[in-house]
Amino acid sequence: MKTLLEMITIEMKEAFKAAGYDEELARVTLSNRPDLCEYQCNGAMAGAKKYKKAPIMIANEVVEELADSKYFASAEAVNPGFINLKLAPEVVAEYLNEMAADENLGVEKEKNPKKVIIDYGGPNVAKPLHVGHLRSAIIGESIKRIIRFKGNDVTGDIHLGDWGYQMGLIITELKKRKPELPYFDESFEGEYPEEAPFTISELEEIYPTASAYAKEHDDYREEALHATYLLQNGYKGYRAIWKHIMNVSVNDLKKNYERLSVDFDLWKGEADAQAYIPDMVEMLKEKGFAHYDEGALVVDVAEETDKKEIPPCMILKSDGAALYDTTDLATLVEREKLYDPDQVIYVVDKRQELHFVQVFRCAKKTGIVKPETELTFLGFGTMNGKDGKPFKTREGGVMRLENLIREIDDEMYKKIMDNRTVEEEDARRTAEEVGLAAIKYGDLSNQASKDYIFDVDRFTSFEGNTGPYILYTIVRIKSILKKYAENGGVLDGTIRPAENDAEKSLMLQVVKFNEVIDNVYKETAPHKLCAYIYDLANDFNKFYHETKILAEEDEEKKKGYLALLTLAKKVLETCIDLLGFTAPERM
């Protein structure tokens, strides 16, 4: 289904052509003066020089060609040459009824769907999730849903940090505490225990203890580095511990991400890429891409057009150890081999941009990925506290993600109980649903690349540009529709042409849905989806306050209102699903 903007652009092209002008001048945009008109066309201004004519003359001639157009209630040429367009209410109503009948609400799927991998989340195992993990998870999940909604084949990969020095630290600390475990007995020949020798709580305490101790004791650090080396070279006792660490950690991570409504298709990590490193290194050497520089193996990725220095991509350190560059390149080798993606999107902290510039250039230069494969860096800014510094606990430490979620849920629970519209048990469940919307909308309503301030008081408010306000609007619509059905009403009406400004504004906002989705998709910009649903919620609430919906005596008119509300609800629910949260039945 074409967007309404596309349809009226086609109509304008015909008018320009009929008036003797280039149809490419017929560029229609939303009006920047909605008090005067809904859409505008400035093509006459652009054509004045080419046709050596006053723009107002061109505009008048084009407007004459629109006299019989069914699309416009009025088309007016105004000085110095703008064309102001007001849509015919019948056309808007007809379009909305077509949207309502379409399972995709008028959104056209990709004609040539792409195979896309989104790399997001990226936590290290054996460490608790903290607020720094929030943005990658929330933004990545929303982008995954948006790209999938347009009909693409999308795979979300968490890409765990599961293979580095932290593993050696945990093994070394465990050996210090429990030397009697069979994993540390080189002569042990039996089966290793199926049950892990630690809980998630113990594991989360072991790592920081070991990390702090290693900074003060060189011998301990050396032992941890050696343990990392043994693990990476297949020592079976340490491989068995590593499997326990992975199982315990991943089970806990799954619970935490489930609470955030974040769902990964792949739970792969750095460890999965290790098998691809030797052949990749050999290929880079054989084909002359890699060379040694001060003992390290590197690939030059600088280009003549660079405005700043781009250092070489480091493949192996002088001691032969692999690095992040190596692992990320090997992961691309693996992805090419197993999934053959058209695009790989990395949703990571924007401070990692240089690293990904190096990796992307190296992957393209060396043929690790095909020339046409899109490698996209989507860098996000920092989530800050009210002081403008990275978000911390009151004591100044890094806040665990589960504690932040609990704090938001408690705040929502208090506000819901103050309203006393739901039972206590329902209030807890509702608080979790609304709390998640507060967190996700609070983040996603900001442009991903910008830093933003996480303000608990503002994000949990039922007023203003917040998640709770959006949900409150949806619940209000649900309540009206439910009340009508409970009184024996049947929702079988069709949307009628608007009769007042509030109704017209709401209809024109709903009409924009597919256009907004296309734009959000092209720009990978969830913040634009948030801006849209905030405007839509405002237009609905204005209509609600100015219109007697259920008290309307004309049954056909009432059914028309309810058909419009049903469509607005579907649009809002689709949008919040793309943002990664849901609305309760009551609030």
Question: Where do the PLM segments sit?
Answer:
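Non-catalytic interaction-recognition regions
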Residues: M1-A93, L105, E110-M587
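Short, charged, solvent-exposed linker or helix-capping segments at domain edges/interfaces
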Residues: E94-M99
